[in-house]
């Protein structure tokens, strides 16, 4: 149920149940909220949860897109919301469609967003009335953790007090890439294509050439949308590497364990190099090896020293990413069509953009040609380093010292279990997170298969903690 901030504050004033505030209603926030309700029911715990997001639509950026060409890059068989029910998404699709669902299908992200909404709604029905989850459409301007509570101050005024706050921030919104900051206000430059209204702005642009800065999955999404909006428009993608994400093969292919995965004497970097060598040599099994390495990536990453992680990010991260985060087969086929027809061009290098009189924006291609652009779109993807984020809440948290960036600029500095570390290095007991903010700690943490595991673990820990505090207070009252 959607409620106003005033209604929630009034309810909170009279509520005796512990309160958990979840900031962010994307996949991370929705998965955690559902698991929190399930864990509360199982433990017989009464609690109140408040799910806050400035968007009225659930699903966050990834799963609120309405473009049917935006697909999951994992098969339906791998996208269950529940670690202990791997076929849950497949069965949901069957019930929805009334026919057998294909486990190896790559569903649209919009459909997956509807699934997450259904999962959360079912959890709410099961938990009521002992546990409640209330949704609030509001921007959280500041989070202020204290010894025994957390205060969330809302941009529109007012505040909510919680016993624990889970910041399900997801991927941080895109910011202007280094060197392009002065173009952020240019009418033909789109800094973050996922902001509300920007897709419509892209669709309404003229038929002139469009520059896509980047060549990863965000570029792919934009290219597919632009190809629908502008059937004859020229698309130019440029990135430093010029590397496109690789493609999944059709069908469900079982992961192939790399023989040395369990050998602690073989480093993560050596494993990555072996897999990339297989890919360069044209081996048919490299995809299975990538997927076989995924379940143990976090353990290997944790064993790397700071220096080894820094070298990996500089020397191997991009190459590994294009093999690890692959395109759905039908998406890859469409991108290949666009490239073959010449409608999409792919270049390596750094785009040179020049402001020209009359509000024009001109691109100088590596070969020397100048192109008068209709639009230039930042498609480099989400910001990794929170210090580069323009999000007001992130900036407030950093400035106040309640959180700190990971030393390598990989998300936030977090402790095992998802607690944020403060500026002084101590971890918060009441300010927690999951998913992409933990990339520096875990590396493999941005996709649903990992986030659902974290959501379950975090929910169990939160319920256990709040139940323990409630019992301690009851004991204190009875003996006082």
Provide a role label for each language-model segment.
Residues 53-98:
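Redox-cofactor-proximal catalytic regions of oxidoreductases
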Residues 2-56, 61, 99-266, 272-468, ...:
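Flavin (primarily FAD) cofactor-binding/catalytic cores of flavoenzymes
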């Amino acid at each position: 149920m959607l409620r106003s901030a005033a209604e929630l504050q009034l309810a909170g004033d009279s509520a005796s149940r512990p309160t958990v505030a979840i900031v962010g209603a994307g996949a991370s926030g929705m998965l955690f909220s559902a698991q929190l309700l399930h864990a509360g029911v199982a433990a017989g715990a009464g609690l109140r949860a408040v799910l806050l997001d400035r968007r009225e639509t659930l699903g966050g950026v990834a799963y609120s897109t309405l473009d049917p060409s935006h697909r999951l890059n994992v098969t339906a068989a791998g996208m269950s919301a529940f670690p202990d029910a791997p076929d849950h998404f497949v069965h949901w699709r069957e019930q929805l469609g009334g026919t057998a669902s294909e486990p190896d299908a790559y569903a649209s992200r919009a459909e997956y967003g509807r699934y997450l909404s259904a999962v959360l709604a079912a959890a709410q029905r099961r938990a009521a009335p002992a546990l409640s989850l209330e949704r609030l459409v509001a921007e959280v301007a500041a989070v202020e953790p204290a010894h025994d509570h957390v205060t969330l101050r809302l941009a529109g005024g007012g505040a909510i007090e919680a016993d624990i706050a889970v910041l399900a921030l997801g991927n941080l919104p895109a910011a202007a890439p280094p060197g392009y900051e002065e173009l952020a206000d240019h009418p033909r430059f789109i800094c973050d294509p996922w902001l509300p209204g920007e897709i419509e702005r892209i669709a309404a642009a003229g038929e002139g050439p469009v520059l896509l800065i980047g060549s990863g999955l965000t570029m792919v999404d934009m290219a597919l949308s632009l190809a629908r909006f502008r059937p004859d428009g020229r698309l130019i993608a440029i990135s430093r590497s010029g590397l496109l994400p690789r493609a999944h093969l059709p069908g469900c292919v079982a992961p192939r364990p790399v023989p040395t995965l369990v050998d602690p004497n073989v480093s993560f970097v050596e494993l990555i190099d072996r897999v990339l060598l297989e890919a360069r040599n044209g081996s048919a099994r490299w995809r299975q090896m990538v997927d076989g390495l995924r379940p143990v990536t976090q353990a290997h990453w944790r064993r790397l020293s700071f220096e080894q992680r820094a070298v990996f990010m500089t020397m191997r991260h991009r190459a590994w990413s294009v093999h690890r985060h692959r395109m759905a087969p039908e998406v890859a086929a469409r991108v290949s069509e666009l490239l073959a027809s010449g409608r999409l061009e792919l270049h390596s290098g750094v785009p040179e953009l020049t402001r020209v009189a009359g509000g024009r924006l001109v691109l100088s291609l590596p070969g020397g040609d100048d192109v008068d652009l209709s639009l230039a779109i930042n498609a480099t993807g989400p910001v990794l380093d929170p210090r580069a984020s323009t999000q007001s809440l992130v900036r407030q948290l950093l400035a106040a010292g309640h959180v700190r960036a990971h030393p390598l600029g990989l998300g936030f500095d977090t402790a095992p279990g998802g607690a944020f570390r403060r500026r002084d290095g101590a971890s918060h007991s009441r300010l927690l997170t999951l998913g992409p903010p933990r990339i520096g700690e875990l590396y493999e943490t941005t996709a649903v298969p990992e986030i659902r595991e974290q959501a379950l673990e975090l929910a169990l820990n939160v319920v256990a903690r709040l139940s323990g505090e409630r019992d301690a207070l009851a004991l204190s009252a009875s003996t006082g």
